[in-house]
């Protein structure tokens, strides 16, 4: 149908603006959690979550090329990032290439700009871009859904990173429901110079001790009503109190953003990154200057949200 052709064309155009001779360049975008709740621990040790994921315009870049020599050669701009099977990009590319018996090889150049171990799904997003890139480079013909089914084997956040936009994630993060795009707003990112592992975040979380859980349903309602202020007021992360107790700097960044005009500032994922939502670009720019001056955050980045449909609201 014409509608599905348009959709297919949008899928193809989402990431891949540049296709030079034999080179494909992909943007792997970061995510923030507008709301994050943990419902409990499952028999298998994983936690049951409910969270609202949102893509933002902050990205790593993957340049991929076919090579005559079989195998995968991955290089990165950061010396401490592994370039073998331990890297999710390598894992994703290898998984598809083995499944489809790809004869040629692949060279992947990964340039990281999303902070590492920051609760922004940088690694998962890189893997998502690798899935999309390999699928197109070798004309494997997989649909977005088929890529997402495979992606969950690489990591719980990877299917979402293929889908992008605004979504509710449930289960261990793999059950995804697309949501209407959020109202236009600006996002300030502040990451202190500390790393918090997801494991630490869960260890600091006393499930019985959570008085009031984040209002995820209220948050979804605000997004559906296209009400930025109602959305911001309901943004909450269940991990935040425990992590701030351990790392007060996260609370300081949050307070500074809110003093400087953020509608709300919240920790993303398992931290330590904080994001503030603003209704005005100039206010955000001023807050970014204050945050840089304060020395609280090692990474300060001012951006906005990424909507899948290129800013055209169509609530399917």
PLM regions and their residue ranges:
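ATP-dependent small-molecule kinase catalytic core of the GHMP/sugar-kinase superfamily
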Residues: 22-27, 35-37, 41-51, 140-264, ...
């Amino acid at each position: 149908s014409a509608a599905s052709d348009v959709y297919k064309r949008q899928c193809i155009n989402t990431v891949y603006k540049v296709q030079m001779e034999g080179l494909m360049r992909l943007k792997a975008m970061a995510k923030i959690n507008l709301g994050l709740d943990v419902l409990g621990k499952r028999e298998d040790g994983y936690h049951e979550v409910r969270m609202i994921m949102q893509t933002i315009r902050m990205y790593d870049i993957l340049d991929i090329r076919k090579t005559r020599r079989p195998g995968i050669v991955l290089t990165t701009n950061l010396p401490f990032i592994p370039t073998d099977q331990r890297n999710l990009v390598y894992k994703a590319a290898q998984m598809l290439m083995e499944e489809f018996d790809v004869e040629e090889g692949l060279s992947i150049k990964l340039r990281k700009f999303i902070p590492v171990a920051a609760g922004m799904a940088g690694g998962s997003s890189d893997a998502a871009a690798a899935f999309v890139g390999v699928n197109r480079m070798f004309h494997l013909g997989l649909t977005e859904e088929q890529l997402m089914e495979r992606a969950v084997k690489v990591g719980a956040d990877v299917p979402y990173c293929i889908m992008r936009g605004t979504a509710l994630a449930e289960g261990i993060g793999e059950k995804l429901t697309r949501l209407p795009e959020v109202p236009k707003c600006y996002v300030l990112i502040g990451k202190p110079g500390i790393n918090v592992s997801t494991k630490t975040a869960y260890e600091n979380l006393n499930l019985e001790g959570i008085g009031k859980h984040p209002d995820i349903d209220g948050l979804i309602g605000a997004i559906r009503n296209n009400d930025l202020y109602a959305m911001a007021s309901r943004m909450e992360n269940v991990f935040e109190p425990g992590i701030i107790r351990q790392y007060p700097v996260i609370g300081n960044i949050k307070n500074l953003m809110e003093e400087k005009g953020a509608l709300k500032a919240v920790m993303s994922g398992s931290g330590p990154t904080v994001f503030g939502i603003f209704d005005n670009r100039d206010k955000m720019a001023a807050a970014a200057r204050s945050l840089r001056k304060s020395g609280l955050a090692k990474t300060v980045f001012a951006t906005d949200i990424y909507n899948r449909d290129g800013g055209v609201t169509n609530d399917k």
